[in-house]
C-alpha cells in the first residue's frame, strides 16, 4: 500500500497476521499506469494482467479495481465485470467514487436488459455525483423505452423515488450506500 488510509483499510479488510511492509517505490501505480496505457491501445488482456499485478502490490487500490472492471467490460466478460465492481465497492468512500460504482452497476444491468435496475442505478449515481455519462445513459434508456412503448412492447416508463430505488437495490443485493467499515476508517 502507498497511502496511510490504504494501510488502515488493508488492515481492516485483510487482517494480516504479519507486519505490513510498504515498498519505497509505487510499484502498484507503475503496473496500473501500464494497464491504463494498454486499455488506451485496446490491449485488454495485457491490461487485465497488469491490473491484477497492481492489485497484488496494493489490494485496496480502487483505481486498479475499476480499471480491471473496464477491461472485463471491453472483453464482454460481464460476470467478472460485476464481481470486480462489487469488490471495488468496499473501497468507494467519496461521492464521486460511489457515483462511479452505481454507473458500473447501471451498465451491468443495462447489458443484462434489466432497464428498471439500470435506470435506478444511473439515477442513484447522479444523486451522489452528477455526470454527463449517467445523463447520456439515462437518455438512452428513456429513448429505448419510449420506442418500445410506441411499438407496444412495454406499457409505461417509471420514475423512482429514493425509497423505491433502495428497495430495488435490496432485492438485487446492490448496496444502497458506502461500506460502513470504510467510512469508519476514512472519516
State the predicted function of each range:
Residues 44, 78, 115-116:
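TPR-repeat structural position
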Residues 30, 64, 98-101, 134-136:
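TPR alpha-solenoid repeat register
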Amino acid at each position: 500500500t502507498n497511502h496511510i488510509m490504504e494501510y488502515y483499510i488493508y488492515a481492516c479488510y485483510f487482517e494480516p497476521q504479519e507486519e505490513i511492509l510498504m515498498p519505497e517505490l509505487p510499484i502498484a501505480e507503475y503496473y496500473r499506469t501500464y494497464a491504463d496505457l494498454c486499455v488506451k491501445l485496446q490491449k485488454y488482456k495485457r491490461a487485465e494482467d497488469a491490473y491484477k499485478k497492481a492489485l497484488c502490490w496494493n489490494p485496496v487500490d480502487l483505481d486498479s479495481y475499476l480499471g480491471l472492471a473496464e477491461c472485463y467490460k471491453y472483453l464482454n466478460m460481464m460476470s467478472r465485470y460485476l464481481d470486480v465492481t462489487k469488490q471495488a465497492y468496499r473501497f468507494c468512500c467519496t461521492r464521486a467514487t460511489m457515483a462511479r460504482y452505481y454507473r458500473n452497476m447501471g451498465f451491468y444491468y443495462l447489458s443484462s436488459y434489466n432497464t428498471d435496475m439500470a435506470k435506478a442505478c444511473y439515477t442513484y449515481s447522479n444523486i451522489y455525483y452528477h455526470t454527463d455519462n449517467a445523463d447520456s445513459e439515462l437518455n438512452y434508456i428513456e429513448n429505448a423505452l419510449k420506442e418500445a412503448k410506441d411499438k407496444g412492447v412495454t406499457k409505461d416508463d417509471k420514475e423512482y423515488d429514493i425509497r423505491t430505488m433502495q428497495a430495488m437495490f435490496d432485492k438485487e443485493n446492490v448496496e444502497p450506500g458506502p461500506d460502513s467499515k470504510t467510512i469508519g476508517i476514512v472519516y
